[in-house]
Amino acid sequence: MLPADKTMNNDMLYHTHTLTNGIRLLYVPVESPVVYCGFVVNAGTRDELADEHGMAHFVEHMLFKGTERRKSWQVISRLESVGGQIDAFTTKEETYVYTTIPAQHLERAMELLADIVFHSTFPEHELEHERGVVLEEIQSYNDSPAELIYDEFDNLLFGDTALGHKILGTEKTLQNTTSMRMRQFVQRCYTTDNIVFYLLGNVRGDKLVRLAERYFGVPPTKRTFRRVPPETYRPTTQRSNKDTYQTHCMIGNRAYHQLHDDRFALLLLNNILGGPNMSSRLNMSVRERHGWAYTVESTLTLYVDTGVWSVYVGCDNSHERDCLRLIHRELCDLASHCVSPRALAKAKCQLEGQMLIADENRENMILTMAKAYLQTGHCLSNDEVHEALQAVTADKLRQVAADIFDKRQLSTLIFN
């Protein structure tokens, strides 16, 4: 067995091991007939060069289109033939390739995952076909202003930098992508010291290590490419005519990075303001009291060296000013006044409960753990999260709100 590193969610243990080539293993043993496993690669949109917009996402698509020993249909059918599933997605900082598989077919899954991550060939004829698929994916986003506004707001916050670029890229950059450029991107970013393989399931740790050594034994490689830190932020207001039935508004600011001392205070603050609960301040004010919007929410994304906090609302054109006024009023109130002790205790209890419920989705839980281990080398336990949240004071919440919700630092994007 691998040595236990830490008590994790729901009192489970997680274990880690590093292969001789630098690939890290994260293992959570649970009683289940199903195994969740996959690779998370520390390579995403922000690792693209100036002429590679959309490359990380396009590579993710092409991983399923053929390897040195498999055609695309063989990749797809290898796990589906035994009832398994394989999928992938790309973020600004990571690429995930993952499977859900009956436990008895774990070796089949690990061999296939290794084949597509380490031995994909990116055939030209498949590239031309998949280019059309990704272009249609871009068009589907363009037809959804409630999704598109998040991408364009990132561009407002980070400008013409990798963090400001759309994950899907653009039609122009996709047309310029070649198989050779894809292989160069993978060679630069998919290095063994840049990869975590994770597994949650009823598998012995020594078996996992043995299979990993058998199938992941590629030569060691090291990442030499360094991410460019975000440029100086300048708040901006922008209005764009999208010919929509509704007005779509987004207000926000750059936020803290994922290891910032005040990240738990901001997480709690965001949940109070516009988290996924009907009792959030924004939902009660904008939707329940006035009926001016169907969707009003705030979101928080933490990156390795920065973050994004934002509020989104979709409303009738006639209610745009009213909604923005109510949002700013809530922001000002949180930045100017301390929440009551009772409200603070309720907010902490609510957030911890939401986290516990979210952990019942085992796939989401292990994906979250894998990202944390990849980026920080550590997975927080429930006890650590509880202690961090309990340490947040009402005055700390107000200080963080005054910092992040500072009206002089807010950017605004409006589609109408």
Regions found by a protein language model. Give the residues of each.
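Short strand-connecting beta-turns/loops that link adjacent beta-strands
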Residues: V30-P33, T91, T244-Y245, D406
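Acidic, glycine-rich loop-and-beta core segments that form the ion-binding/anion-interacting portion
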Residues: T244-G252
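N- or domain-start disorder-to-order transition segments that initiate the globular core
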Residues: M8-V34
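Flexible, small-/acidic-enriched active-site or ligand-binding loops
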Residues: T236
